[in-house]
């Protein structure tokens, strides 16, 4: 005889809610950014998705089940950890790490994929597709597809397949089909193009689990809402640990989901908002053209169905993004980040590949934590600003993922020498 769960068995401690933020507006816009720039054939699917999401967001049964899986499967809440040795080394503010690296699958991506997979099941879709760069989103989608018994196809650029061979094997082990993409720069942009083509072809049976706060409305809103659990926890944990909100929040920004998850619960506060700092990938330097700093060195335009800051040349062609981190080499940044940048809600900086590698090594040696190369960008920028702050100030760095997936690539780049 099987175990029968009692009514309300998914409920533990506090009940999850998905916040209602002031933006986007009814047209899916954050100021001028966002919207739906897609083929007419996709509009009904996006409208269906938005309606299903808004209904699910208010359904206690959906929220209860999501809360259960976030706690019991993913491992939430994650600690807000005082990095004492790092704080002492920098000699300025007290540094706390939001430990998203401790989640199941090793990164923040699971917050979003659990939500979208439950939504796919609710909508009666049996097949899910995804794009992935570093492979973390792909692994996360393959994981939730296995959990809920969904067919899964993941698109990944050939260059990223090479850099992230371990994650490719993980996805296959979890039952997903990985389809390498040979077009263009063979990275995340090209994988996204192929995933969108698949969705257009199979829209009636397939749910596209988009991995970042990009794409057409309602994706930037939906992914932001699912990731906002990061910032909501930081709010509560900060009050418990030091009785007030932090002075600054720092997170790496590619498409921008880990950063928006941290920032959004603070961004719309009427007063007392911490300084919000997003760190883009400067790659080999902004002047070289080999970078992924869409806000720092890009222009406004449309990519993958959304109006936002992105990288393109004088002919309007998207330029290949470059970063040592496979998860940051996307040539655009989400519309809400674009809005934050223009409105002065957050500030955006960038660090080079070389600086990120130093951050990677520094955290490992001082705190015994090997960060993802994405997160290492946030560490590297913190190294510049934390020493200038007062010792009674508090900085929270979002440690969006662990670095297991990057160790082989870092070893190759450093020639095995530390």
Curated annotation (Swiss-Prot):
Does the record bear Thylakoid in its keywords?
Answer: no
Among InterPro entries, the record links this protein to: Trp_synth_b_CS (IPR006653), Trp_synth_beta (IPR006654), Trp_synth_beta/beta-like (IPR023026), TrpB-like_PALP (IPR001926), TrpB-like_PALP_sf (IPR036052)
Q: Which GO terms describe its molecular function?
A: tryptophan synthase activity
Q: What is its EC number?
A: 4.2.1.20
Pfam families according to UniProt:
PALP
Known catalysed reaction(s)?
A: (1S,2R)-1-C-(indol-3-yl)glycerol 3-phosphate + L-serine = D-glyceraldehyde 3-phosphate + L-tryptophan + H2O
Q: List the PROSITE patterns hit by this protein, alphabetically.
A: TRP_SYNTHASE_BETA
**UniProt-listed CDD domains:** Trp-synth_B
Specify the pathway.
Amino-acid biosynthesis; L-tryptophan biosynthesis; L-tryptophan from chorismate: step 5/5
Q: Which domain of life is it from?
A: Bacteria
State its cofactor.
Answer: pyridoxal 5'-phosphate
UniProt family annotation: Belongs to the TrpB family.
Q: Can you say what this protein is called?
A: Tryptophan synthase beta chain
- Gene name? trpB
